[in-house]
Structure formats: C-alpha cells, structure tokens
Design a protein with these regions (language model features):
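Beta-propeller blade repeat segments, especially FG-GAP/WD-type strand-to-loop junctions
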Residues: 92-106, 117, 138-143
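Acidic, small-residue rich beta-repeat scaffolds with periodic aromatic anchors
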Residues: 27-41, 47-48, 61, 125-198
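Hydrophobic residues embedded in beta-strands of well-ordered beta-sheets
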Residues: 92-93, 102, 121-123, 146-147, ...
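Acidic/hydrophobic-patterned starts of short beta strands in beta-sheet-rich repeat architectures
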Residues: 79-88, 120-125
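Beta-propeller blade termini
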Residues: 68-77, 113-122
Length: 198
C-alpha cells in the first residue's frame, strides 16, 4: 500500500504535469490567435508574405488586383497543431508563420493540388490524353513546414482500349514498374481521388 508521503508526492506530480499541460495548451491557443490575426492582416493587404528567396509579396502581387474570388481556408497541413492559411485561385499557396515571419510554404496549382490534412500533405492528381494517362505525386510536410516530395507515379493507356489495364504502362519516377507494385504504392492516392471525385 502507498504511504501518505508517496500519495502526496504523486498528487504533487499530477498537479505539476497538469499545470504544464494547461500552460502548453494556453500558449498554443495564443499562438493560433496571433497567427490567425497575422493571416487576416495579409488578406487585408497590411503585411506581405515572404518566399524562401527572401522576396516579399502582398496578396495582390500573387493574384493580381481583383482578389474577390480568391478562396481562403485554414488547415493544419503540416501536423504541428497550428493551422496554415491556404489561398487559391488558379495558383495555390500555403502560408505559415515561421520564425516570426509570414512565409509562403508552398506554391502549386489549384486545379490539380488537393490538400490531405490527415496525411500532412498535398496530393497532385492530373488526367491527360493521347493516350489517356494519370499522374499522381504526394508532397508531405514536416512539422516545421519543410516539404518532402514523394515519387511521381504515372499510368498510360498504351494499348488505347479506353481503360487502364494489364497491357498498359506503369511508371514510377519515369521508370517502368510492375502493375501490382504500382497499384499497391498508389492505392491511397487513387482512393483519395475516387472519394473526393477528382
């Protein structure tokens, strides 16, 4: 049985851990509020965002004078617990506050890029013709916003029978790959494509 002193020590430790967690959660809420306020200042044209090359851009620099039809949303794409600002209209940008500066984390295409928060990344999917083909690649984000690009997967209806099947061409980073391996490696991407109707 636990003595009175051991019980007091356990209670003190629980209070300390609980206090640390409360401070951590409060700090995260404050960080999220400050970050969201900074995002709004960017959207209002008050502050610029910086690309990795050091150049700064206001919203109008990225999308032109008329920004009325620019889609914006918040999503924690890198899994750090703080939401990033996603803005798109033809071009797709993700902004994150890094080291006290609003930084453009990602630049892609709004037509082909699909955010997948559960996987901390962006799925690129595109269909093409002559012959029919599909391209997939996934860019994952580390918690600090660092991008990790995955392989590019392509399949071609090389026999031009109107469907991707056994006799067709499967590539991984431009190198022919066995259909079974290709299907296994792209299974999650194809499931996302089908689920979201891409």
């Amino acid at each position: 049985m636990m003595g009175m002193r051991a019980k007091k020590i356990c209670m003190a430790m629980l209070l300390i851990v609980g206090g640390i967690m409360a401070v951590f959660l409060a700090d995260r809420k404050v960080a999220e509020k400050i970050t969201e306020e900074e995002y709004q200042r960017f959207l209002d044209g008050e502050v610029p965002a910086m690309k990795e090359n050091g150049k700064t851009y206001f919203l109008e620099d990225l999308f032109g004078e008329d920004v009325s039809d620019v889609e914006t949303f918040l999503s924690d794409i890198d899994g750090d617990g703080v939401k990033e600002l996603h803005i798109r209209n033809g071009i797709y940008y993700i902004l994150k506050e890094k080291k006290g500066k609003l930084t453009i984390l990602y630049e892609g295409t709004a037509i082909y890029d699909e955010p997948v928060e559960a996987m901390s990344g962006i799925l690129y999917y595109r269909e093409g013709g002559a012959p029919y083909n599909e391209t997939y690649y996934f860019t994952r984000f580390e918690k600090d916003g660092t991008m990790v690009e995955g392989p590019t997967y392509q399949c071609y209806d090389s026999d031009e029978d109107g469907e991707i099947g056994v006799e067709d061409l499967y590539l991984k980073d431009g190198v022919e790959q066995d259909r079974t391996a290709w299907e296994k490696e792209t299974e999650i991407y194809r499931a996302i494509k089908n689920e979201r109707g891409l």
